[in-house]
Amino acid sequence: MKKVLVNQVGFLCNAPKKAVLNFQANEFSVVDGNGKKAFDGKVEHFGTDEISGEDTYVADFSALTEEGKYKIVADGQESVLFSISNDAYDKLMKDICKCFYYLRCGDALSKEFAGEYYHKPCHMTKATVYGEDVEPVDVTGGWHDAGDYGRYSTAGAVAVAHLLYGVRFFKGLLDVHYDIPKVAGDKGNLPEILAEVKVELDFLMKMQRENGSVWHKVTTFNHAPFLMPEDDREELFLFSVSSLATADIAAVFALAYTVYKEYDAEYADKLMQKSLLAYKWLLDNPDELLFFNPDGSNTGQYDEAEDISNRFWAACALYEATSDGKYYSDAQELKNRLEEFDKNAQKKGYQGNVFTCLGWAEVAGLGSLSLLLKREENALCSLARNSFVAEADRLVKVSKENGFGLCMGENDFIWGSNMELLKYMMVLSTAIRIDNKPEYKLALEAGLDYILGCNSMDISYVTGNGEKAFKNPHLRPTAVDDIEEPWPGLVSGGPNSGLHDERAQTLRGKGLPPMKCYIDHIDCYSLNEITIYWNSPLVFALSGILE
């Protein structure tokens, strides 16, 4: 089928702008809502690329800067209607930020703030410490992690980190207003994004034991069936502590200290004390303590290959927050260990430079972000700068290998491929601040175009944003709330050539290219689930685009 593929939300006035055609055409026009021509241009033939399987043609209309609603027309085919405006992404930004409110655990979502997506309080019982004969623990609050109702320390810490680094790097994020209720402990001066992040920080504090270690997760023993959160009344379990969770919490509390001290010194000091307590536990327990589910449990495992990157992040975050040289020394030693691991690893869960990895499974790049914020002339800060520039250069090279200008290779289309892209967009938006190369911006904007519909599925991977936005996330509350549309702003996991779930496996044997390994179906947890740490990198990257 002939398609004109375009960012379905739109473009900023002075941003690069393109559409991709999967059919031959020589010329194209941009017309307004009344059919009046606003721009004519020549189509450039790129050719076939491995990730889309399409013979692609590119229509560049970057020269059109006048605000308005437009369509692309070529060879009798039309795109969806999109906007050109400096406000083009205002709704998108509000939606992706407010999703964290909709994912709150414990709190009732009121009609005043959640509208038709309201629900009663959930998961208010104390949690049993699995395998220990101790009193149950109150760990209420925080955010539901994903399509399930679990709450996971490492995942939550990384999502919070994306948001707080977004605040540190791009001040505009503090000015995003999206109507959420006042949170406990807010003295009335917290910007909305920091009020929402406080919800998760308060929960993560409860996940820390008195000795500083941190429970890896709190979930039911197995995933709940598809029901509303308030109807999930199975016993909650706190599963064992891990050095992964403890290091991530040490890091994110130190980062949070640097932000919240401007608004609430007492709260910030509490975060720092808990960060130091976690870090002391790490020093007292130098051997890695990884995490694996007990037999019979199927909730998220969030296992990692090593804890070196987590400890590195913690040391870097504490050094940035305190300027204490002992953390620099620790980070230097951990850097050496991580380089050795990276050199010898038989199987890596990441592409590119380990010091720019920004996801829950490999967090060294988060440590690098703290070093970039330090802005010092020393070996580690130079490593961070050089790593981000080198990785951005790699991504630009990859982006030139397909007609979409997308900085993803065939191996990036894994479970949560959209997060892979969004992490790369974080790298590019950070690298722009180090070395403002035009090609970084092109690759960054092309990534956003892909997420918002300029892809061979012709679908926007953000609910409620774009004419053909996906509508069937693997998400319990939206599956059973009897409301036709899911709440807006959710980011889909996206195409996954592994096709890991039963519904996705119906695509096997069809010889599909990676970009087309996708179904918008509620059963497709390996293609169409959502999670807090798929929204958070988009918040960071979009903040960079809007800066």
From Swiss-Prot:
EC numbers, comma separated: 3.2.1.4
Spans traversing the lipid bilayer: none
Active-site residues annotated for this sequence: D148, H474, D520, E529
InterPro entries membership: 6-hairpin_glycosidase_sf, 6hp_glycosidase-like_sf, Cellulase_Ig-like, Glyco_hydro_9, Glyco_hydro_9_Asp/Glu_AS, Glyco_hydro_9_His_AS, Ig-like_fold, Ig_E-set
Predominant cellular place of this UniProt entry's protein: secreted
Keyword Hydrolase: yes
Signal peptide as annotated in the record: none
Example GO biological process: cellulose catabolic process
Enzyme class: hydrolase
Keywords: Carbohydrate metabolism, Cellulose degradation, Glycosidase, Hydrolase, Polysaccharide degradation, Secreted
Summary of activators and inhibitors of this protein: Is not inhibited by methylcellulose.
Record bears the keyword Secreted: yes
One function term, GO molecular function aspect: cellulase activity
Functional description taken from the UniProt entry: Glycoside hydrolase that rapidly hydrolyzes short-chain cellodextrins to yield either cellobiose or cellobiose and glucose as end products; cellobiose is not hydrolyzed further. Also shows limited activity against endoglucanase specific substrates (carboxymethylcellulose (CMC), lichenan, laminarin and xylan).
Family statement: Belongs to the glycosyl hydrolase 9 (cellulase E) family.
Name the record gives this protein: Cellodextrinase
Protein species of origin: Butyrivibrio fibrisolvens
